[in-house]
UniProtKB/Swiss-Prot annotation:
Entries under Pfam families matching the protein: WAP
CC per GO annotation: extracellular exosome; extracellular space
UniProt name for this protein: WAP four-disulfide core domain protein 2
Single Gene Ontology BP annotation: innate immune response
Chain ranges of the WAP domain: 31-73, 74-123
Resulting phenotype, residue 91 to S: In BENP; uncertain significance
The entry's keywords: Aspartic protease inhibitor, Disease variant, Disulfide bond, Glycoprotein, Protease inhibitor, Repeat, Secreted, Serine protease inhibitor, Signal, Thiol protease inhibitor
The protein's role, per its UniProt record: Broad range protease inhibitor.
Disease in which the protein is involved: Bronchiectasis and nasal polyposis: An autosomal recessive destructive airway disease characterized by persistent abnormal dilatation of the bronchi, and severe chronic rhinosinusitis with nasal polyposis. Affected individuals suffer from sub-normal lung function, chronic productive cough, excessive sputum production, and recurrent sinopulmonary infections.
Record's subcellular location: Secreted
GO MF: aspartic-type endopeptidase inhibitor activity; cysteine-type endopeptidase inhibitor activity; endopeptidase inhibitor activity; serine-type endopeptidase inhibitor activity
Mutation effect (residue 109 to Y): In BENP; uncertain significance
Phenotypic consequence of residue 49 to R: In BENP; likely pathogenic
Length: 124
């Protein structure tokens, strides 16, 4: 008789361990490298992700106001400086980069005031 009880008990224990292990693996992914870019606040509060593990490839889960999006990360620290729209950087109205890694040293790929992006010294 004890052997009959051990079967269902063992099955329940095994099922519990499998579910617990699955939760640990899928619930928290390792944070991906890079830093989230500055994103405009989304008024729709769209929740595309909760953690980096929910984003494909090297995309990071980044917040924009009350929303979250999978976004291509910046790979350098610091934030882009505020752009003075009254004095756009003349001569730089073309894209010089797409991501931080294309900029030399500590420079970051940031908006330059005329609708394009260029390598600039970040604020720390």
């Amino acid at each position: 008789m004890p052997a009959c009880r051990l079967g269902p008990l063992a099955a329940a224990l095994l099922l519990s361990l499998l579910l617990f292990g699955f939760t640990l693996v899928s619930g928290t992914g390792a944070e991906k490298t890079g830093v989230c870019p500055e994103l405009q606040a989304d008024q729709n509060c769209t929740q595309e992700c909760v953690s980096d593990s929910e984003c494909a490839d090297n995309l990071k889960c980044c917040s924009a106001g009350c929303a979250t999006f999978c976004s291509l990360p910046n790979d350098k620290e610091g934030s882009c400086p505020q752009v003075n729209i009254n004095f756009p950087q003349l001569g730089l109205c073309r894209d010089q980069c797409q991501v931080d890694s294309q900029c030399p040293g500590q420079m970051k790929c940031c908006r330059n005031g005329c609708g394009k992006v260029s390598c600039v010294t970040p604020n720390f």
